[in-house]
Design a protein with these regions (language model features):
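A structured, charge-rich N-terminal accessory region that forms the first stable segment of a protein
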Residues: 1-99, 104, 110-112, 177-183, ...
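Short, solvent-exposed secondary-structure capping/transition elements
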Residues: 44, 115-116, 133
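Active-site-proximal structural scaffolding
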Residues: 65, 117, 150-153
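Short, intrinsically disordered, charge-biased short linear motifs at domain edges
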Residues: 86-94, 108-114, 120-126, 140-148
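Residues immediately within or flanking Cys/His clusters that coordinate Zn2+
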Residues: 97-103, 121, 132, 154
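Short, cysteine/histidine-rich loop/knuckle motifs that typically chelate Zn2+
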Residues: 102-106, 123-126, 137, 159
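An acidic- and aromatic-residue-enriched active-site/binding cleft used to recognize and process polar
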Residues: 119, 127-129, 162
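Domain-exit/linker segments immediately C-terminal to small folded modules
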Residues: 132-210
Length: 210
């Protein structure tokens, strides 16, 4: 088992991660689930890499003010614009929802959008389903944070470990699993809500929709 500093050295030489696996507006927790899966990282190891001063069991809020973007860029090897869009902006007038909100069909494709955490967004723009916060099996809610336990349970309830998705999900690339028209609908909604931010910060969502 590699020590945390050895994980960081190993990832500095290159990680098993392809930016083309991502969709426009993908939330940081969704990105981290893909990254952990591709690089066989435990929740504790990944938490230490992205926020070494944070207790992995306590976790950290997925907001821009609480996460060091430069470190995140170095570990994940993604453009800063992509990562900024993946995090909630606490300066926006709309409050973020404290519980993990998801579309069950998107979850089945291994995708979660940062837009789903905005309280005034109540439906998935691709599948037109109401966004859920409760586990389909036990009814519990999962807090919208990143922690060792959250990383270890992608698209699963923290209380009972039941899957939030329909059927077995693909953890890596969402692109082949989701219809192009659905990807376009998600991108359009993202641009409508965060258009200036997306374009100005250089997240370059267009290639992900090809």
């Amino acid at each position: 088992i590699l020590a945390f500093d050895e994980w960081e050295l190993s990832l500095s030489r290159g990680s098993a991660f392809n930016p083309k696996w991502l969709m426009p507006g993908e939330s940081l927790v969704s990105i981290l689930w893909k990254f952990a899966c591709a690089n066989v990282l435990s929740g504790d190891a990944l938490m230490h890499l992205i926020s070494p001063c944070v207790d992995p069991s306590e976790g950290i809020a997925l907001v821009r003010d609480d996460i060091e973007l430069s470190r995140l860029c170095r570990i994940l090897r993604l453009p800063e614009g992509v990562l900024r869009v993946s995090l909630l902006d606490t300066t926006l007038p709309c409050r973020p929802h404290p519980a993990f909100r998801y579309c069950r069909l998107c979850a089945a494709h291994g995708y979660h959008s940062v837009l789903y955490q905005l309280e005034d967004e109540d439906r998935c723009p691709a599948h037109h389903q109401a966004l859920d916060t409760r586990c389909p099996y036990c009814g519990s809610e999962t807090p919208y944070i990143v922690s060792a336990r959250v990383i270890a349970a992608p698209f699963r309830c923290l209380s009972c470990r039941f899957h939030c998705s329909y059927g077995r999900l693909s953890l890596l690339s969402t692109i082949p699993a989701m219809r192009r028209q659905d990807r376009v609908s998600i991108r359009r909604r993202l641009l409508l809500r965060m258009g200036n931010t997306v374009e100005d910060e250089g997240s370059e969502p267009q290639p992900y929709c090809d």
